[in-house]
């Protein structure tokens, strides 16, 4: 069981709190279950834990779902995602789940109502719940058709009592809060694997690890390329210079094979004119232009997160 939850004492009137961390986790997966970056024994995840009253549950759940949909939509994965309402198996309560049937029925009815109110189209997964409560899993299929969970939002009805977490309501009565456990992008390694699959390695410019590569035609152009590259780097772009003594055709082919979004070819004419000659990996030659003009093109693509 994986659980990272920090608890702390609060004033009794404090009835909503949220805690979060980005951490490295370890899970002893069977060797036959491991698969590339999709299922690994060591992974990184950003988690949030929201401690709240029952009447806050729906609004907070909605915010968690909106956050996950925004993140997945921004990176281009949401369109292929499906939603699964993961429930307990009442026939197998003692081996996997904690809590009473009444607690589970209540938690699942609350979640069902929330999903209905939010108009979420989902399937039901029996025996897929966490040991402490039901959850909404955002699922994604890999290129082989196998479905994995990208993001999960869990309603926890049990751990607050175990950790001695209570709040005092408006009537002065001691009550147990709910806890929502949520992620926004899920396991980084798995999400990265699906991004690589989805884009066939050609990640959009705004998320590409290398956005621009300068390709000097001759050694005479290397210093000019380095000066121009430094200007882009200073603006926050990820830029390299190919200083190898190779023919320009090979440099272009290598950059294409490595799926570099923009290649800036620089020859003697560019040095004399103070220009660069950009190529896009999909659109080809864009024609000679000043570095400022190219920067404007790059800024538009990156700032608007265009899928090119």
Language-model segments: what does each one mean?
Residues 23-55, 81-88, 163-178:
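Residues forming anionic-ligand binding surfaces in small-molecule and nucleic-acid pockets
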Residues 73-153:
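Metal-assisted phosphate- and nucleotidyl-transfer catalytic regions
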Residues 199-253:
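Generic long, charged, amphipathic alpha-helical segments
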């Amino acid at each position: 069981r994986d659980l990272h939850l920090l608890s702390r004492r609060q004033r009794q009137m404090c009835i909503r709190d949220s805690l979060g961390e980005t951490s490295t986790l370890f899970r002893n997966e069977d060797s036959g279950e491991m698969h590339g970056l999709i299922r690994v024994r060591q992974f990184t995840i950003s988690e949030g834990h929201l401690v709240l009253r029952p009447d806050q549950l729906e609004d907070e759940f909605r915010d968690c779902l909106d956050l996950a949909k925004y993140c997945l939509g921004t990176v281009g994965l949401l369109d292929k995602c499906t939603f699964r309402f993961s429930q307990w198996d009442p026939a197998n309560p003692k081996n996997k789940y904690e809590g009473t049937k009444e607690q589970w029925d209540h938690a699942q009815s609350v979640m069902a109502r929330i999903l209905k109110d939010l108009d979420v189209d989902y399937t039901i997964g029996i025996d897929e719940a966490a040991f402490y409560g039901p959850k909404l899993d955002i699922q994604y299929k890999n290129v082989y058709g196998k479905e994995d969970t990208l993001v999960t939002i869990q309603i926890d009805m049990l751990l607050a009592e175990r950790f001695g977490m209570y709040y005092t309501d408006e009537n002065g009565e001691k009550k147990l809060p709910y806890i929502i456990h949520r992620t926004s992008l899920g396991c980084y390694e798995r999400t990265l694997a699906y991004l690589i699959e989805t884009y066939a390695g050609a990640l959009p410019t705004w998320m590409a690890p290398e956005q621009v590569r300068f390709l000097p035609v001759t050694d005479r152009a290397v210093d000019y390329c380095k000066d121009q590259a430094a200007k882009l780097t200073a603006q926050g772009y990820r830029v390299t210079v190919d200083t190898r003594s190779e023919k320009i055709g090979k440099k272009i082919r290598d950059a294409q094979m490595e799926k570099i979004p923009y290649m800036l070819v620089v020859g003697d004419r560019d040095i004399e004119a103070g220009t660069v000659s950009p190529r896009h990996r999909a659109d080809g030659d864009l024609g000679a232009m000043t570095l400022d003009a190219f920067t404007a093109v790059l800024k538009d693509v990156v700032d608007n997160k265009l899928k090119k």
